[in-house]
Amino acid sequence: MKRESYQAEMFNWCEALKDQIQKRGQLDQFEDQIDKMIEALEDDQTTEEDWYKQAAALYRDITESDDTSERRAYVPIGKHVLPKLPYKYSALEPYISRDIMILHHTKHHQSYVDGLNKAESELKKARATKNYDLITHWERELAFHGAGHYLHSIFWFSMHPNGKRRPTGALFQMIDLSFGSYSAFKEHFTQASKKVEGVGWAILVWAPRSGRLEILTAEKHQLFSQWDVIPLLPLDVWEHAYYLQYKNDRASYVDHWWNVVDWREAEKRFEQAKEVVWKLY
């Protein structure tokens, strides 16, 4: 996307944001931040990266202001919510179509949120009544829908039309240490993604027990993978992530996905994840 096109999209986003927070009665609270965002967009010396960082900070502040202090501290049982995307549904075209993004986000991810909330609520009811007849079912539902919700909540923010297509800094160095080179990592991750059996994910993770990165795959969301790791960069290879556009050609979807990957989220997660280091075995 050219600078002018992204700039126009950001201007529209700022105006829509103003309307939204005005309806919530919070315009006075955030008007200065939005105006500064608009000034940055008009400044020829600022970059798309500057705009992204400022918009992300503004979005975070507004989102957090809409939560209660309890909600910020933890998610009450059965109260998980669908995260909003940091870009338009059409933003990842031509690599991922608008129709796929709408269906994937509003239907499939929402179903995982709903399923997780249902499972948590049923397990809470079981504890209260001491009736554990269906515990096996609800624990499976908890694992499936919970993993689906959490992985998607990373996945959306690991893509962007103007994202960082190659990691740098500490994460790049750890990729080099863990896989030998970035190109070796990319080939490994690509091949793992293409060869997940059935439906599932390929995930770059930090492994605190080994002190390095690993590439894992998971069938569905939760099967045949490892514990004690922290996901950094996931790629969804369920058919609903690509079938409307690529039909049964998962390989083409995976190859094109590298055109929308955004390493900024993975780098941010790694900065926190690398602080978790267990005794090495």
UniProtKB/Swiss-Prot annotation:
SUPFAM superfamilies: Fe,Mn superoxide dismutase (SOD), C-terminal domain, Fe,Mn superoxide dismutase (SOD), N-terminal domain. Fe cation binds at H104, H152, D236, H240. Its EC number is 1.15.1.1. It catalyses: 2 superoxide + 2 H(+) = H2O2 + O2. Disulfide bonds: none annotated. Keywords: Iron, Metal-binding, Oxidoreductase. It holds the Pfam family Sod_Fe_C. Its cofactor is Fe cation. One of its GO terms (molecular function) is metal ion binding. Binds 1 Fe cation per subunit. Destroys superoxide anion radicals which are normally produced within the cells and which are toxic to biological systems. Belongs to the iron/manganese superoxide dismutase family. This is Probable superoxide dismutase [Fe]. It comes from Bacillus subtilis (strain 168).
